[in-house]
From Swiss-Prot:
GO terms for cellular component: cytoplasm. Belongs to the methyltransferase superfamily. RsmC family. It is found in: Cytoplasm. One of its GO terms (molecular function) is nucleic acid binding. Specifically methylates the guanine in position 1207 of 16S rRNA in the 30S particle. This is Ribosomal RNA small subunit methyltransferase C. It catalyses: guanosine(1207) in 16S rRNA + S-adenosyl-L-methionine = N(2)-methylguanosine(1207) in 16S rRNA + S-adenosyl-L-homocysteine + H(+). Its EC number is 2.1.1.172. It comes from the Bacteria. Pfam families: MTS, MTS_N. InterPro entries: DNA_methylase_N6_adenine_CS, Mtase_sm_N, rRNA_ssu_MeTfrase_C, RsmC/RlmG, SAM-dependent_MTases_sf, Small_mtfrase_dom. It is an enzyme of class 2 (transferase).
Length: 339
């Protein structure tokens, strides 16, 4: 496959990685690590993306870690950070990894200029020197080294806490950087929750983010068996904390669409993601819709919110034979289909 632009600029600078024990993190979307592994002493990946983890897990040449925090011991002496779309997530990853790996760790940062990668210059200032060494494909390549003792990292310090009010219920939300709707109540989610019928049985919250939708559903329908899934380890950690903050019970786990779900559900409810990195991305939502019937019970129901311009109805109609519009405003529509 062709490499992403950040990987292409990294490919031009392979000499930086010769003889190094490299840990790759951030917004990595291609299989460039296999090529990089040929030039490094060792190559490992820390990813918060479950789909990407599954792609590399089991390969002998690359050790792959998935989670919201790197906890495993490692002999890494260089970080290759692909700049994520959220600046706060970049700061989270940088602080966490340098606290783990310590002084004298080298770092390479690559990213598209429009993603704000230039922010690394100020962000890294407390750790040591960093400079830009290459520009190509509208991307930048930075190299630096941690020459100061990195402060200790406590994940609890990184949760943003806020409240969501819905129909006389107050939900306490705890959200890590990089999680959808970080710090606010998404208007699409609000319309979805206003439109939902009474829920029963097993309910799946797909793309759970910080756990707002799942927590409201469980608060209003306390007898449901709630599964909450997301591809992001940061979202999983956030949803677990949000449930805990509201004394609610739910089963929260990573899943690449239906890869790890075990149930047939009475309801699949979703505010599905369509921004992956800086590009609009539909494939996971298409799979959610296409395979929904085989993951629903008899007369089970799919209900989702989407931006009005997204062409989901034809996919839903093909899967179910019909697609109903339950509600809409000037930006969002609520779609439903029954098995």
């Amino acid at each position: 496959m062709s490499y992403s632009a950040p990987s292409q600029i990294t490919q031009r600078q392979l000499a930086y990685f010769e003889g190094k024990h490299v840990l790759i993190a951030g917004e990595l979307i291609d299989d460039f690590p296999f090529e990089l592994a040929k030039h490094c002493e060792s190559t490992s990946i820390f990813t918060t993306n479950y789909s990407y983890y599954k792609q590399f897990a089991g390969h002998n040449s690359i050790q792959c870690y998935f989670g919201s925090e790197l906890t495993e011991p490692t002999n890494v002496d260089m970080i290759l950070l692909y700049w994520p779309k959220a600046k706060a997530e970049a700061e989270y990853l940088l602080t966490m990894l340098l606290a783990k790996l310590g002084k004298n760790t080298e770092i390479v940062v690559v990213g598209e200029n429009r993603s704000g990668v230039k922010s690394i210059e100020k962000m890294f200032a407390d750790f040591g020197p960093i400079n830009k060494f290459d520009s190509a494909r509208r991307c930048s390549f930075y190299w630096g080294q941690c020459t100061e003792e990195a402060p200790t990292f406590n994940q609890q310090d990184w949760f943003k806490e806020y409240q969501v009010e819905f129909e006389n219920h107050t939900i306490e939300v705890r959200s890590l950087p990089g999680v959808f709707s970080h710090g606010e109540f998404d208007k699409g989610s609000e319309l979805l929750l206003q439109t939902l019928p009474a829920l029963r049985g097993h309910v799946l919250d797909f793309g759970c983010g910080a756990g707002v939708i799942g927590s409201v559903m469980k608060t209003i329908n306390p007898k449901i068996h709630l599964d909450m899934v997301d591809i992001s380890a940061l979202a999983i950690a956030s949803s677990i904390e949000t449930l805990k903050a509201n004394n609610l019970e739910g089963n929260v786990f990573a899943s690449d669409v239906y890869s790890d779900t075990k149930e047939n559900y009475q309801f699949i409810v979703s505010n599905p993601p369509f921004h992956a990195g800086l590009k609009t991305h539909y494939s996971s939502t298409e799979e959610l819709l296409e395979k929904a019937p085989q993951n629903l019970t008899h007369e089970g129901q799919l209900i989702l919110v989407a931006n009005s311009f997204l062409q989901y109805p034809p996919i839903i109609e093909k899967a179910f034979g019909e697609c109903l519009t339950l509600a809409k405003n000037n930006k969002f529509k609520i779609y439903s289909a029954q098995k």
